[in-house]
Amino acid sequence: MSSWSRQRPKSPGGIQPHVSRTLFLLLLLAASAWGVTLSPKDCQVFRSDHGSSISCQPPAEIPGYLPADTVHLAVEFFNLTHLPANLLQGASKLQELHLSSNGLESLSPEFLRPVPQLRVLDLTRNALTGLPPGLFQASATLDTLVLKENQLEVLEVSWLHGLKALGHLDLSGNRLRKLPPGLLANFTLLRTLDLGENQLETLPPDLLRGPLQLERLHLEGNKLQVLGKDLLLPQPDLRYLFLNGNKLARVAAGAFQGLRQLDMLDLSNNSLASVPEGLWASLGQPNWDMRDGFDISGNPWICDQNLSDLYRWLQAQKDKMFSQNDTRCAGPEAVKGQTLLAVAKSQ
């Protein structure tokens, strides 16, 4: 562990396939415990046989060059609208790049070309309204792209061209109102898609056609009113589905058809008064047990005979039900305020 300034180059070493950010921060903490002191204008550096990991935060200066063996770089919490054009020059072994909380408004199309081995790009909490086409032309190995909490109102398919190995895409906390058709068509390796906390009212029917093994889908905190029967059909391996905090008033019959490996379903805080018979039939059947549970609280359930199918399902799955005391009937008057589970038991 040492300080590093732009006047002190370092000879390259080996490469670690993936240096986790958590491990990096732990190493920095350990170095502090050992009494290592750093100049306030220098970035923090951890050097090992696997390469250099560098963290820069104010009042440190943004580096003018990087050691050739850099595998991890964090430049965060600076008041920047643009990055230095040559920031990544000479760092061809870089695998993780964290640029969160900088106020970035745009990126150059050539920005990532010097780092063809990049696997993680974190752009959380910036001011990006778009990405330049061609940004990812040299990013065939990128696995994780985080664009959380920017100012994206639209997405263009062309922005993501070149991403062949993408496994995790986080677009949460933006201002997205709609998505283009074919957005994920080429992302066959995608495992996690996070579209939570946007302003989406509808989703393109082909949204999930492309990924072959999607495991996590975050759609919470949007304005969705209807869940169609075909949206989830291409993803039989889906394990976590978050639809909470929308305006869902209707879930189509068959919407969950084939989701036999689902571990977690969150439908809480929507506008559901009823659901079609047979909706729950495939969930947890025949050999899966919804091991991480489900939540249907915060909906205005009308607890009449139209929920008989749901009553039966709840009786079988009650041990996995979250927020049981907050899952209550909004009507009819005779059962208003009672828990849905209590009504189910009385049937």
Curated annotation (Swiss-Prot):
Gene3D superfamilies cross-referenced by the UniProt entry: Ribonuclease Inhibitor
Subcellular localization: Secreted
Paired cysteines (S-S): 43-56, 303-329
Position of the signal peptide: 1-35
Record SMART domains: LRR_TYP, LRRCT
LRRCT domain: residues covered: 299-347
Site (Not glycosylated): 306
Glycosylation sites: 37, 79, 186, 269, 325
Example GO BP: positive regulation of angiogenesis
Gene Ontology CC terms: extracellular exosome; extracellular region; extracellular space; ficolin-1-rich granule lumen; intracellular membrane-bounded organelle; membrane; specific granule lumen; tertiary granule lumen
The UniProt record lists the keyword Disulfide bond: yes
LRR repeat windows: 93-114, 117-138, 141-162, 165-186, 189-210, 213-234, 237-258, 261-282
Family annotation (Pfam families): LRR_1, LRR_8
Keywords of this entry: Disulfide bond, Glycoprotein, Leucine-rich repeat, Repeat, Secreted, Signal
Tissues of expression: Plasma.
Highest taxon of the lineage: Eukaryota
Record protein name field: Leucine-rich alpha-2-glycoprotein
Annotated source species: Homo sapiens
